[in-house]
A protein has these predicted regions:
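Short, glycine/polar-rich helix-capping loops at beta-to-alpha or helix-loop-helix junctions
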Residues: 24
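Conserved SAM-binding loop
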Residues: 28
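Conserved SAM-binding strand-loop segment of SAM-dependent methyltransferases
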Residues: 34-40
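Short, structured coil segments at secondary-structure junctions
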Residues: 11, 31-33, 115
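Short beta-strand element of Class I
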Residues: 14-16
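Conserved SAM/SAH-binding beta-strand->alpha-helix loop
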Residues: 21
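Conserved SAM-binding loop of SAM-dependent methyltransferases across substrates and taxa
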Residues: 1-10
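Class I S-adenosyl-L-methionine
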Residues: 44-55, 60-204
């Protein structure tokens, strides 16, 4: 978020971040040491911030909305969406932006009704080498689909890489011998990588 604001040339007087992962916090503070960390979103109050807020943006946990997740919707980790709504109501920012995965239409409608704006679906493949469809709810005016920059996976891959980053022969064989994994990890769609996925583990 702060990178985007920097690129847009938007000066920020105070930047608050709600994060609980200690490694994410370390990275943020290394790159943006003036960031004010306020802890878990469920404990954030207007009094803690004590400033006029112009913009709030975030992405509530997607695991319970994602097709690759547990499918529990607002009853799982994705219920933290309601904390985003609560903070919006308490701080009354001029603008907001929420990002999340493409999900079931009934869940999408709940978020749309709560925020009062229709989502915009943007595929990151327009500006990167990865297919990644995401929904964005925002009251920021004049948000539009970015132009396709035509970035392919071949454009961003390094050709000379230290062997320590190579898959082992055993690992390569495991992927290529498994039909499902081979399709998932080696297929290119128009020169684009499939959506990258990661496992969420809360740090201690």
């Amino acid at each position: 978020g702060q990178i985007a604001l920097d690129k847009l040339g938007i000066k920020v007087d105070n930047y608050f971040a709600s994060e609980i992962d200690k490694y994410a916090i370390q990275v943020t503070q290394k790159n943006y040491p003036n960031t004010i960390q306020v802890g878990g979103v469920e404990f954030v109050t207007k009094e803690m911030i004590n400033h006029k807020i112009d913009l709030i943006y975030g992405g509530s946990p997607c695991q319970s909305f994602s097709r690759a997740g547990d499918g529990t919707g607002f009853y799982g980790k994705s219920k933290l969406f309601w904390e985003f709504v609560r903070v919006l109501k308490e701080t009354k920012p001029a603008y907001f932006l929420l990002e999340n995965v493409v999900m079931k239409k009934e869940w999408e409608r709940v978020i749309t009704d709560a925020l009062g704006v229709e989502p915009i679906k943007i595929n990151s493949s327009l500006v990167s080498a990865q297919n990644r469809n995401r929904l964005y709810w925002t009251n920021i005016p004049n948000v539009y689909q970015p132009k396709d920059k035509g970035v392919s996976l071949q454009d961003i891959l390094f050709r000379d890489v230290d062997e320590k980053y190579y898959l082992t022969e055993k690992g390569s064989k495991y992927i290529t011998d498994n039909t499902r994994l081979k399709k998932k990890f080696t297929a290119l769609n128009g020169g684009k990588a499939l959506t990258l996925m990661s496992q969420y583990n809360q740090s201690k």
